Amino acid sequence: MVWLVAMTPRQSSLCGLAAHGLWFLGLVLLMDATARPANHSSTRERAANREENEIMPPDHLNGVKLEMDGHLNKDFHQEVFLGKDMDGFDEDSEPRRSRRKLMVIFSKVDVNTDRRISAKEMQHWIMEKTAEHFQEAVKENKLHFRAVDPDGDGHVSWDEYKVKFLASKGHNEREIAEAIKNHEELKVDEETQEVLGNLRDRWYQADNPPADLLLTEDEFLSFLHPEHSRGMLKFMVKEIFRDLDQDGDKQLSLPEFISLPVGTVENQQGQDIDDNWVKDRKKEFEELIDSNHDGIVTMEELENYMDPMNEYNALNEAKQMIAIADENQNHHLEPEEILKYSEFFTGSKLMDYARNVHEEF
C-alpha cells in the first residue's frame, strides 16, 4: 500500500508578498557576520553509499525519526524544514546567499505574513516537506526498479533480486545466476548470508496478498522505503524492537532505549559521545515516543512516533523546533531567532551573532 499525499496550494496577496519580501531582504542584507558552514560529510557519505548499493534498502530514511538500526536521525529537523533544499545549504554555499534562502523559506512558512511562524504554520510546512521526501523516494524507486527488472515485465522475483544484489557486492552476476538456477549453494561469506536472510524476510513482508513472491514497482517501493506502507512500517518497528528489547517483553523501557551501542570508546571523547547519546535518547523517549508517559514504549507508540505522515507528531515536532530558538518565549519563531539558530534548521551556522541585528533595528 502506497500512501498518496495531497497538498493544498498556498495563496496570498501579491502586494503583501512583495512588501514582506522587501522586509526580509532588508533584514538579510544587514547581516555581514562571518559564517561557519557545518560539516555535511555524513550526508554526502550516505548519498555515496546509496549510489553504490541503489537496490539495497537504505539504513537512513529522509523525514523518519529513527534509522533502521534504531539510532536517532540526527538530520531529521533539517530534513523536515528544508525538504529538497537540503543540498542548497551544503558547505560550499556562500553565507549571504544562504541567509537569503533561509529568509525566503521563512516567508513561505509564514502563511499569514505576520513576520513570525506559529506552531500550526510549522506543522503544515513539515507535512509538505515530508511529502517532498516521499515524492523523491517514488521517483528514485522507478530507477531502482528498472535495475532489478531488466526485462521490463513489471515484476521482480526474489531470485532475480538476489542476483542483482550479489552482483552489486562484487560477485560475478552470470555465475550467481547459474548457481541459483541449478539450486547450488552460494559461495558467500557469513555476513552476506545474514544480510540475505534479513532481506528475504523483508521481501516477503513487502509482498502484498495474495502472496506470489513477485514484487511490483509499488511493492518494491515498500521494500526499500517502509515508511510508504503501513504494513512495512510495522515490520520496521518489529525489527527495531528485536534489537532493543533486551528482556523480550515486547515493550521498551527507558534503560533499554538508551543502552549504549556496542564498542564504546573508553576515552574522554568517547565519554562525551556516550553522554550525548544518553541525553538525546532520554529526551526523545520521555517527550515524544512515550505518548502516555507511563515509562514504557509499546510497538504501537513507536509506530506512531515513526510514522512520517502523523499530523499529531508533526505538531509536536513543530512546537519542539520553535522552542529551540524561541528566545523571547512568545511561542513563535521570528527572523532574528531563526538566523541565530540557523545551524539547527539548516546545518550551517550562517551568522555568529544576532545581537547586531537587534541593534540595527
UniProtKB/Swiss-Prot annotation:
It is found in: Golgi apparatus lumen. Ca(2+) 6 binds at D326, N328, N330, H332, E337. It comes from Mus musculus. Keywords: Calcium, Glycoprotein, Golgi apparatus, Metal-binding, Phosphoprotein, Repeat, Signal. Glycans are attached at N39. GO terms for cellular component: Golgi lumen; late endosome. Residues 1-35 form the signal peptide. One of its GO terms (molecular function) is calcium ion binding. Ca(2+) 4 binds at D245, D247, D249, Q251, E256. Binds calcium, probably via its EF-hands. Belongs to the CREC family. Residues 97-132, 136-171, 196-231, 232-267, 277-312, 313-348 form the EF-hand domain. May regulate calcium-dependent activities in the endoplasmic reticulum lumen or post-ER compartment. This is 45 kDa calcium-binding protein. Ca(2+) 1 binds at D110, N112, D114, R116, E121.
